[in-house]
A protein has these predicted regions:
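Amphipathic alpha-helical polymerization modules
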Residues: 1-61, 68, 74, 81-202
Length: 202
């Protein structure tokens, strides 16, 4: 069922309003997993990753623009946000209700990056639970059907929030402590990539 939405103010935290699951893939794995836990963050290379380090999968751009949603899992790619464009650091990240991700670099102009893709199953109770809120497809669940957020039958996204059932108090505390440490550290250090990413996604 739909959990209440808790505001986190981190742009890469995504809540699903409606049906569907995010699609994740571990770098070392060929089979994707599925989750409703949208507690994501950008790594130092700009990859959008889940709390278990898996890549968040999305629809690749076509000639630099948003293209159609792939129908097969093979058509998805890990979402990667370019942290600089022509040597200018990213100044803003937007994740829209329909899954499209855009980034701006010092000006008002937003560039397409990728689009989050969701999976739907005819029988959710047939999914195999893997722990940590992630699931895998089985014969009982049926094959995944891919769609874009806000498509008919698919959830829309809310950036800057998490579904209450997916908010783990310890995770939230860890994230807050981390942010505090980075803030203290950055007062002394030159700003590194990871701090830049951290700051932008808040």
């Amino acid at each position: 069922g739909q959990g209440a939405i808790v505001d986190t103010d981190r742009k890469t935290d995504l809540a699903l309003l409606g049906n569907g699951l995010f699609i994740l893939k571990k770098p070392t794995s060929i089979t994707p997993t599925f989750t409703r836990n949208g507690s994501f963050s950008l790594d130092n290379s700009g990859f959008l990753r889940a709390s278990n380090d898996a890549y968040v999968m999305g629809a690749p751009l076509v000639d630099g623009n948003f293209g159609p949603t792939p129908t097969e899992l093979d058509g998805l790619l890990p979402i990667q946000v370019p942290l600089t464009r022509e040597d200018i650091p990213m100044s803003e990240l937007k994740i829209l209700a329909d899954g499209r991700i855009e980034a701006a670099y010092g000006t008002e102009v937003s560039y397409p990056v990728s689009a989050i893709t969701l999976g739907l199953f005819s029988n959710n109770s047939g999914l195999k639970e893997l722990g940590g809120g992630s699931y895998s497809q089985t014969d009982k669940s049926g094959l995944v059907r891919l769609g874009a957020p806000s498509d008919t039958g698919y959830a829309s996204l809310e950036s800057g929030g998490l579904e209450a059932s997916n908010v783990n108090i310890t995770d939230e505390l860890t994230a807050m402590i981390k942010a505090q440490q980075q803030f203290n550290g950055s007062a002394r250090l030159m700003q590194t990539n990871s701090e830049m990413v951290e700051k932008l996604t808040r």
